[in-house]
């Protein structure tokens, strides 16, 4: 009997050249689920935990809806057990030499290589992502990450001398992130000696499989623990006493809520928020290559978010035409089909993008959809949104996958204004055949990663991160290692949580100031105003506060600054920032050296002021001399603000740039009134920031003496000094939305408030939590920690090719 024809003949295939299915068997994934009796628990301390009386959620194929397994949901006691297991494992893991940790990471990479088919099949089956992206991208990069960080671990004692591991790290991942994002964060943490407790979303078997592979290697079972649970467990994990740092990935609003809930807690917080990226297409670009870049950025399964596309007006019509043609050739389908470009993200993601597109249409946007896409849910076609009014709500919110929002621009300056006008600062690519134009745009973009004529390239040796509301945590390269280290000898962060602190009233009112009697002493202080915009000026409140010496005698009066004065100081700092950041390192160094020389000329006056505050004359003179040396030291360091990385496997360098934060608010400590002020001022200015500073509340006169020299040495607005009630000024600065970062060296309650208030614009915060700092010691007063906190990293990729 003749065979039944089940498909097209070979001749017809060669005539039509149409795609056919290339299915990948998922038998190995189902077999692994069978070993768990189709019931997944948690992997803690090297073994599976399946506690009784726990709720479970189904793990389903997002396309067919088939139930693959059930996943137990963790509760608070499970979280506590996992943290305790990680804490116990940390004692042995961190004590071992880096070479031992390197060997363990290398063995884990080998195990992943042996079981890579199981890993990519399971990930594609459960998430719906295209299997070729997982197989050829994620799994291979996961192995590279382990090998790279094994090398870093083996050289830790020499390369990272002076640093020690933080402890137990809590990792929190959202449903939209793949297992690779977990690898980006656990690899550096494990390499430097930390242990990890990861909280993954319900029905996420791939991270559990990775934990099993790591736990079965042998002597270090508790270094990686994975729990599956709902979002309600996030604050429970983050507030565990044993957790030293929380690495959170998710939406900006979730990050804000976590920032507020962790204010005053012992755990540090690293945020990686949002998924949207940006692509700039100029009129000198190779349009066809740029169109492929759009496809890689928005309509592949590499990234979890959408894309904002800026196209120069002169090539708008041509670029849109070619982009729409390319969209018509995209294929969507089951993730295990090796011939599809896009898989599916599940019903929740489909609902999100449908709402976004409906709202965009209601706001006047044009929507174009194309591609070979199955009609049933949860598939959604590639979508191109254009003509969206700039002031519409959809132009401000994050773009979901698989949507591209396209907008025109006329000049490079306008492109930077539009691109930097959003609160997000994750990643971007610039497409231009003119290197000068590409570098100008790349340097001007306020993002963490920039690719030139490419998009989405990643390498373990290159740092990846963001700025603004995309968070300020990093992974990859040396920056990723420092995320999980603290300076050796410094005590672990202690909780300064005060449950009685009222955030609504803290620092709201300024205590009344009354006449304090006659000034007593050989050298009464001259009347100072606020140093704003390069000159002294009267405070808005037209009020002054008395300053007393160590004997309780009246030493002088300083201006009582308030919210209006802080607003003026921040505006002056913003006006000065572009010019100062654009100065060459040599020019900035010269001005710092000039200020150091001015301090030395004023040595006797400054020493006498310190002597009235209780310091001995020799100690006072030594503080002035050390302050001048600090200025010169940071002036010398300013010359080395970045270096070049040569990436293996790619032709071309990656520039690791150290860029200024912007306007930096600094609240100085009471102790070391001159040295602490200079030690915080010098690195901030050296790296191109402008500052608004609140000097020592006990003796602000020394900082105001320095301001007399800054008025003649520095450009106007570079450094602004506001005196007054510390709590009130702290409140004004912490709540200010145009302050890019804040350092606070004051009380425990003030530290808690600053951490809580920083959630407004998610500014990075460095708070002392009421602990004193040895400013006269090199490690604490001028160590590498200051250099890391005073600037942010930008990775600028310059790949070469045809």
Curated annotation (Swiss-Prot):
Signal sequence segment: none
Superkingdom per UniProt: Eukaryota
InterPro entries named among the record's database cross-references: Ald_DH/histidinol_DH (IPR016161), Ald_DH_C (IPR016163), Ald_DH_N (IPR016162), Aldehyde_DH (IPR011408), Aldehyde_DH_dom (IPR015590)
SUPFAM superfamilies: ALDH-like
A cellular component annotation (GO) from this entry: membrane
Pfam families reported in the protein's UniProt record: Aldedh (PF00171)
A GO molecular-function annotation: aldehyde dehydrogenase (NAD+) activity
Official protein name in the record: Aldehyde dehydrogenase family 16 member A1
Organism this protein belongs to: Homo sapiens (Human)
Gene: ALDH16A1
